[in-house]
C-alpha cells in the first residue's frame, strides 16, 4: 500500500501512530515539529532516511566513499540545464564530492513516499560551497538495505 508522509523541518521525533507509542531517532533532517504517523513503516522510514543522511554526510566530509554507501553501483544523477535534461552516472557526484572537499551541509526532509520495496524522498538541501538545491531521490530496498537509485535536482 502506498503511503505518503509529509515531514517538515530539521532533526528528531518520529511518532508511531498505532498504540500511541513514541520512538526517538536521530535522523538528520527530521524535527520534533514533524507530524509523522508511520505505524508499521517506522523501520522503513528510518532505513530510507539513513541513505539520505549518508548522502549529506558525504557532502559534509567531501567523501566519495561515504557517498558510495548511499547509492547503488548503477545509480544516476540528473538535472535540467538550459532546457536540456542531463543524466550522468553517479560517479560524477563522487568526483564532485572529492573536488569540493568538506563543507557545511544541512537539509530538510519534505516528503517520504513508500510503495512496497521502492520509495521516493524529496529534500531541500544547502551546501555552504555550492548553494541550495531541491533534491529528489528514488530508492529501492536491496537485501534489507535501502539504496538510492537516482538523484535528480534543481538549483534553488
Label for each model-derived stretch:
Residues 55, 67, 75, 121, ...:
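Hydrophobic pocket/interface hotspot
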Residues 23-61, 69, 73:
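Short, low-complexity N-terminal intrinsically disordered segments enriched in polar/charged residues
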Residues 71, 81, 113, 124-127, ...:
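A mature extracytoplasmic/lumenal domain signature
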Residues 1-30:
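Bacterial Sec-dependent N-terminal signal peptides
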Residues 73, 117, 144-145:
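Beta-strand-connecting loop/turn residues
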Amino acid at each position: 500500500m502506498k503511503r505518503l508522509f509529509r515531514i517538515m523541518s530539521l532533526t528528531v521525533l518520529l511518532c508511531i501512530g498505532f498504540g500511541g507509542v513514541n520512538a526517538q531517532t536521530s535522523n538528520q533532517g527530521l524535527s520534533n515539529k514533524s507530524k509523522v504517523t508511520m505505524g508499521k513503516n517506522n523501520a522503513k522510514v528510518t532505513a530510507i532516511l539513513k541513505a539520505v543522511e549518508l548522502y549529506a554526510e558525504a557532502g559534509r566530509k567531501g567523501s566519495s566513499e561515504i557517498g558510495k554507501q548511499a547509492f547503488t553501483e548503477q545509480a544516476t544523477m540528473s538535472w535540467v540545464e538550459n532546457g536540456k535534461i542531463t543524466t550522468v552516472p553517479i560517479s560524477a557526484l563522487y568526483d564532485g564530492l572529492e573536488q569540493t572537499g568538506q563543507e557545511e551541509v544541512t537539509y530538510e526532509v519534505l516528503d517520504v513516499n513508500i510503495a512496497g520495496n521502492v520509495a521516493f524522498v524529496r529534500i531541500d538541501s544547502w551546501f555552504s560551497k555550492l548553494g541550495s538545491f531541491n533534491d529528489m531521490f528514488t530508492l529501492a530496498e536491496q537485501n534489507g538495505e535501502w539504496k538510492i537509485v537516482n538523484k535528480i535536482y534543481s538549483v534553488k
